[in-house]
Amino acid sequence: MSITAVYPGTFDPITCGHFDLIERAARFYDRLVIAVADNRNKTALFSLEKRVALAKEVTADMPNVEVIGFSGLLVDFVREIDGNVLLRGLRAVSDFEYEFQLASMNRKLAPEVETMFMTPAEQYAFISSSLVREISALGGDVSEFVHPVVAKALNEKQL
C-alpha cells in the first residue's frame, strides 16, 4: 500500500522549519503533498500562487514531494488526492492543544485519515512565518530562517 501524507499550511512564507519537517517526512512516505492553503481568515503577504511557487522552488530536488494549492475543507482535499495521513508540526507544548482539537475534528470528519505529529529540529523550533514576516518588514535579515529564494521574494516585497 502506497502512503500519501499531506502537510497543510499557509506557508506565508515557507521557512527552514517547514523545510526541515518536509525533508524528514519525505523519507517516511511514498508521496508527500505540501498543501498550501488559501485561508480566507488570514491576510497573506504572498498570493496563493506565489506561496505555491516558492514552496515548489524550495522542494524542487525532492522527487516524492508535490506542492498543491487548495481552498475549502482540508479533509475534502485530502480525500481528493487519496491522502492517508495528515502531517502536522508541533513547535512547542503551546501548539499541542490547538493541534489536538484539530486532529480530533478531522478524525470525526474523515476517520480513514490519520494525523501524525512531528517536532522540528531544535535549531528551527522558534521559527514561525509570522516572525519571519515581521523581521523582514522591519528591515531585518531573515536569510538564516528561510531559503534564499524566499529571502529574495521577501526583500522584493519590502521595496
Swiss-Prot record:
ATP binds at residues 10-11, 18, 89-91, 99, 124-130. One of its GO terms (biological process) is coenzyme A biosynthetic process. One of its GO terms (molecular function) is pantetheine-phosphate adenylyltransferase activity. The keyword Membrane does not apply. It comes from the Bacteria. InterPro entries: Cyt_trans-like, PPAT, Rossmann-like_a/b/a_fold. Substrate binds at residues 10, 42, 74, 88. Its EC number is 2.7.7.3. Pathway: Cofactor biosynthesis; coenzyme A biosynthesis; CoA from (R)-pantothenate: step 4/5. SUPFAM superfamilies: Nucleotidylyl transferase (SSF52374). Signal peptide: none annotated. The keyword Magnesium applies. Keywords: ATP-binding, Coenzyme A biosynthesis, Cytoplasm, Magnesium, Nucleotide-binding, Nucleotidyltransferase, Transferase. The record marks 18 as: Transition state stabilizer. Homohexamer. Reversibly transfers an adenylyl group from ATP to 4'-phosphopantetheine, yielding dephospho-CoA (dPCoA) and pyrophosphate. This is Phosphopantetheine adenylyltransferase. It comes from Hydrogenovibrio crunogenus (strain DSM 25203 / XCL-2).
